[in-house]
Amino acid sequence: MIEFDNLTYLHGKPQGTGLLKANPEDFVVVEDLGFEPDGEGEHILVRILKNGCNTRFVADALAKFLKIHAREVSFAGQKDKHAVTEQWLCARVPGKEMPDLSAFQLEGCQVLEYARHKRKLRLGALKGNAFTLVLREVSNRDDVEQRLIDICVKGVPNYFGAQRFGIGGSNLQGALRWAQTNTPVRDRNKRSFWLSAARSALFNQIVAERLKKADVNQVVDGDALQLAGRGSWFVATTEELAELQRRVNDKELMITAALPGSGEWGTQREALAFEQAAVAEETELQTLLVREKVEAARRAMLLYPQQLSWNWWDDVTVEIRFWLPAGSFATSVVRELINTTGDYAHIAE
């Protein structure tokens, strides 16, 4: 299995170094649900600004304030503790009376707004996240500037970030140990983390191998292509390659890579043979995913940051702004810009 730090770069390994998240204010995330609260219903959506607090801790504190069970507070995605983040929490509080959430106090947190909503906010039910990052102590401004220009055109690999695999790769190691035994894993959180790490690692490896090709965005016979921003996909045939290539070049279509599991992977012929060869040695993880009935799926191979802009404060400090769809990792963008020093853990899902 390829170590995360050794995964293939789309734009080549960065020439310079820089500091990511020298302080929480250098990493700002604003959650974009893609919809507004209904204004009525048994749930309350609460938009919270937090600094130095993880999502679960704040959710538990909100439940305690509202005198409800912790399971009655949900959220669309986990946000990094060591960052300034805006996100929505959802509390089930039936009844006509609206609690005064402006009285909710927790160090590092501030309630920005709240309103009634008809439906529970479920994990993954967000459109994306807007990021404002500050990279400090940049050692090679010219290299970073050119990479930002190139990313606007060619995007970045849509890798799952290192944090998906746990501290020191602990989640992936857990998956490997589990794969080597038939011992049931009763802890639901461990099951989820380990299976996710296994599938993510296989996806990353397939993408890393594809990126070694001379033209990474060249459609081949049997590729599974996805309409940009959609989850559905279809298989490319030889007769359509020229037209499909034009649509990929126009970013209308995206080449996908496998999230291996049970059932068909989605690709056929040449593309399927390539994906299977890329992870041929990882039989234990593949067997685990099939054994635990994790269905195979697809994920775009490349990621195009939207609304990408940047501003150099001085020759060694740059502020970068961009928007990513749910499930994408900001560190996949940063990884193509600099060799980072400091904390490298942030998830946007």
Swiss-Prot record:
Q: Where is the active site?
A: 80
GO cellular component term of the entry, any? cytosol
Keyword Cytoplasm included in the entry's annotation: no
Q: Which reaction does it catalyse?
A: uridine(13) in tRNA = pseudouridine(13) in tRNA
Enzyme class comes to isomerase
- One family from Pfam that matches here is TruD
Task: Cite the entry's keywords alphabetically.
Answer: Isomerase, tRNA processing
Specify which residues bind substrate according to the UniProt entry for this protein. 27, 129, 329
Keyword Nucleus assigned: no
Q: Give the function comment from the record.
A: Responsible for synthesis of pseudouridine from uracil-13 in transfer RNAs.
Q: Which family does it belong to?
A: Belongs to the pseudouridine synthase TruD family.
UniProt name for this protein: tRNA pseudouridine synthase D
Q: What species was this sequence derived from?
A: Escherichia coli O6:H1 (strain CFT073 / ATCC 700928 / UPEC)
- Biological classification of the source: Bacteria, Pseudomonadati, Pseudomonadota, Gammaproteobacteria, Enterobacterales
Q: Which gene encodes it?
A: truD
